[in-house]
Amino acid sequence: MIREERLLKVLRAPHVSEKASTAMEKTNTIVLKVAKDATKAEIKAAVQKLFEVEVEVVNTLVVKGKVKRHGQRIGRRSDWKKAYVTLKEGQNLDFVGGAE
């Protein structure tokens, strides 16, 4: 059993993009920014507990940080982890529906 404190730290924010909204409409998949050290099991447990929906599968990937310039200084943004969470049939979770 994963502790509740950990579950609250796993999910960072919804990732809102054109690709994410298309995935929600077509395949009932939500896209989330998650903690870099989060596992698929932790992500699944956190989504099920916090949003009270049934999760079918979780796919994750690490997004590499971009190199950015500020004047002559060159810096790099941090890497972050993205999770595609597919919900079971009949389940619904809409982050961007009210934005229209």
UniProtKB/Swiss-Prot annotation:
Q: Which top-level group of life is the source organism from?
A: Bacteria
Organism, by scientific name, is: Salmonella choleraesuis (strain SC-B67)
* Function summary: One of the early assembly proteins it binds 23S rRNA. One of the proteins that surrounds the polypeptide exit tunnel on the outside of the ribosome. Forms the main docking site for trigger factor binding to the ribosome.
Protein name, per record: Large ribosomal subunit protein uL23
InterPro entries from the UniProt entry: Nucleotide-bd_a/b_plait_sf (IPR012677), Ribosomal_uL23-like (IPR013025), Ribosomal_uL23/eL15/eS24_sf (IPR012678), Ribosomal_uL23_CS (IPR001014)
* Assembly and oligomerization: Part of the 50S ribosomal subunit. Contacts protein L29, and trigger factor when it is bound to the ribosome.
Q: Which GO terms describe its molecular function?
A: rRNA binding; structural constituent of ribosome
Task: Cite the Pfam families for this sequence.
Answer: Ribosomal_L23
Encoding gene (name): rplW
What are the UniProt keywords, alphabetically?
Answer: Ribonucleoprotein, Ribosomal protein, RNA-binding, rRNA-binding
What is the taxonomic lineage of the source species? Answer: Bacteria, Pseudomonadati, Pseudomonadota, Gammaproteobacteria, Enterobacterales
Q: GO terms for biological process?
A: translation
SUPFAM superfamilies per the UniProt record, alphabetical: Ribosomal proteins S24e, L23 and L15e
Q: Which GO terms describe its cellular component?
A: ribonucleoprotein complex; ribosome
Q: Which family does it belong to?
A: Belongs to the universal ribosomal protein uL23 family.
